[in-house]
Amino acid sequence: MLQMAISNLDGVSSAKVEINCVIAPHKAQAQIPGLANVKNIVAVASGKGGVGKSTTAANLALALAREGARVGILDADIYGPSQGVMFGIAEGTRPKIRDQKWFVPIEAHGVEVMSMAFLTDDNTPMVWRGPMVSGALLQLVTQTAWNDLDYLVIDMPPGTGDIQLTLAQKVPVAGSVIVTTPQDLALLDARKGVEMFRKVNIPVLGVVENMAVHICSNCGHAEHLFGEGGGEKLATQYGVEVLASLPLAMEIREQADNGKPTAIADPNSPIALIYQELAVTSGRGLF
């Protein structure tokens, strides 16, 4: 439209308009060194498992990429890594090693992906103590050769223990997104997640409420299976915004299981547009 308007001006025979968007780097903790080739790190966390944190992280990364950003995702959920499956990366895929030191992330759907699952067998449980896991995770963070990323999304392990604290204190996270369901038990643990980030001076960008409502595919009846308004209550309590409220929908699960999360499997669907808005508001929250 701008190009057309300029072309229609008197004395203008032709016009060419180029728009260049530059994403600025942000770092909440000045004392922590930045990560090479990464501008902004966004941690996606939850107080407990089973609330859809990993699905949210995957769709957030893909939605950011659809906005034109260069994006990577790090699966920091050591005990239950799932990003490889969600991004359709074949079992047994291993990252290349550069200069005998750097892991080269695997690219899928336009996003760079790194996970401990790429370095271990899928059937082997991670029977490691906290300090060992923390050390391995820091090595994964600092020795991955990311390629000039605007955003690195970290899929955090659930909870608020040693692993989460180590990441929060030693990785230059710019902001965090808290994922919860409306259920009281989930909200109780989500509050602990918010408090943890506040104690280490990492901004909480907002809350994502998963499984907010279920709509019957046969009759269209809406039912709040896990309670109602929990995400809004949590956001109000801590003075942050609800970044997204997502339904309990079968297609979200099916598309993630099939290796193409909703943000790219059905990009024009109402649910995908919610993820797209989540990407925009999360990015805006860093500024």
From Swiss-Prot:
GO biological process, one term: iron-sulfur cluster assembly
GO annotation, cellular component aspect: cytosol
Keywords: ATP-binding, Hydrolase, Iron, Iron-sulfur, Metal-binding, Nucleotide-binding
Binding site for ATP: 47-54
Pfam family name, one: ParA
Gene Ontology MF, one: ATP-dependent FeS chaperone activity
CDD domains documented for this protein: Mrp_NBP35
InterPro entries reported in the protein's UniProt record: Mrp-like_CS, Mrp/NBP35_ATP-bd, NUBPL-like, P-loop_NTPase, YlxH/NBP35
Similarity comment text for this entry: Belongs to the Mrp/NBP35 ATP-binding proteins family.
Function: Binds and transfers iron-sulfur (Fe-S) clusters to target apoproteins. Can hydrolyze ATP.
Protein name, UniProt field: Iron-sulfur cluster carrier protein
Species of origin: Pseudomonas fragi
